[in-house]
């Protein structure tokens, strides 16, 4: 909240509208001189931001009050994230390795990589995996060794897909 100093009592004038004259309009930055006047280089620091407020004193006389505004930091204030809670930029950080994830579900699935649990077991060889997708990829190695499961009854050809075998049989 901006607190303004009290205006000294103003004697009642004949004109009900007593205001400070508006400031002259000037460009915010000095223009570059010389042949490259269209260049985008800016000389010197940025001028201070001014806030002008139209106020009315206790006698009903309007006046303007100008204050210099402080530069506000851009964006929300940054702070360090504690493990498992939303981080300063992206989301949820892992307490083990400090990786940051957008959702708590992604963090939860990532934390499996730090544990020793391997709940997905291959039925053919007994090898265990942390993720079901890794088990599915492993099962393909067993299928590749055995060969395609669908064999043509008329010739020695084999197919991965039953629809491919059916099309092949029609060609015989």
Curated annotation (Swiss-Prot):
SMART domains: ZnF_C2H2. Signal peptide: none annotated. This is Zinc finger protein 580. Involved in the regulation of endothelial cell proliferation and migration. Mediates H(2)O(2)-induced leukocyte chemotaxis by elevating interleukin-8 production and may play a role in inflammation. May be involved in transcriptional regulation. GO terms for cellular component: nucleus. Gene3D superfamilies: Classic Zinc Finger (3.30.160.60). GO terms for molecular function: DNA binding; zinc ion binding. PROSITE patterns: ZINC_FINGER_C2H2_1, ZINC_FINGER_C2H2_2. It comes from Mus musculus (Mouse). Residues 19-30 have a biased composition (Pro residues). Residues 1-92 are annotated as: Disordered. Keywords: Chemotaxis, DNA-binding, Inflammatory response, Isopeptide bond, Metal-binding, Nucleus, Repeat, Transcription, Transcription regulation, Ubl conjugation, Zinc, Zinc-finger. A zinc finger (C2H2-type) spans 92-114, 120-142, 150-172. GO terms for biological process: cellular response to hydrogen peroxide; chemotaxis; inflammatory response; positive regulation of endothelial cell migration; positive regulation of endothelial cell proliferation; positive regulation of gene expression; positive regulation of interleukin-8 production; positive regulation of leukocyte chemotaxis. InterPro entries: Znf_C2H2_sf, Znf_C2H2_type. There is a cross-link at residues 31, 118 (Glycyl lysine isopeptide (Lys-Gly) (interchain with G-Cter in SUMO2)).
């Amino acid at each position: 909240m901006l607190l303004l100093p009290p205006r000294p009592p103003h004697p009642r004038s004949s004109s009900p509208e007593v205001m400070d004259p508006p400031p002259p309009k000037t460009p915010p930055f000095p223009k570059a001189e010389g042949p490259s006047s269209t260049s985008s280089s800016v000389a010197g620091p940025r001028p201070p931001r001014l806030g002008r407020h139209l106020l009315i004193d206790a006698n009903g006389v309007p006046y303007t009050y100008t204050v210099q505004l402080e530069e506000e930091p851009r964006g929300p204030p940054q702070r360090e994230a504690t493990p498992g809670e939303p981080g300063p930029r992206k989301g949820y950080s892992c307490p083990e390795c400090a990786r940051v994830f957008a959702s708590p579900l992604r963090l939860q699935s990532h934390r499996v990589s730090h544990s020793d649990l391997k709940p997905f077991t291959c039925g053919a060889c007994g090898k265990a995996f942390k993720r079901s997708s890794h088990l599915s990829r492993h099962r393909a190695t067993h299928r590749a060794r055995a060969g395609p499961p669908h064999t043509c009854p008329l010739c020695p050809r084999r197919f991965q897909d039953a629809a491919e075998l059916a099309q092949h049989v029609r060609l015989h």
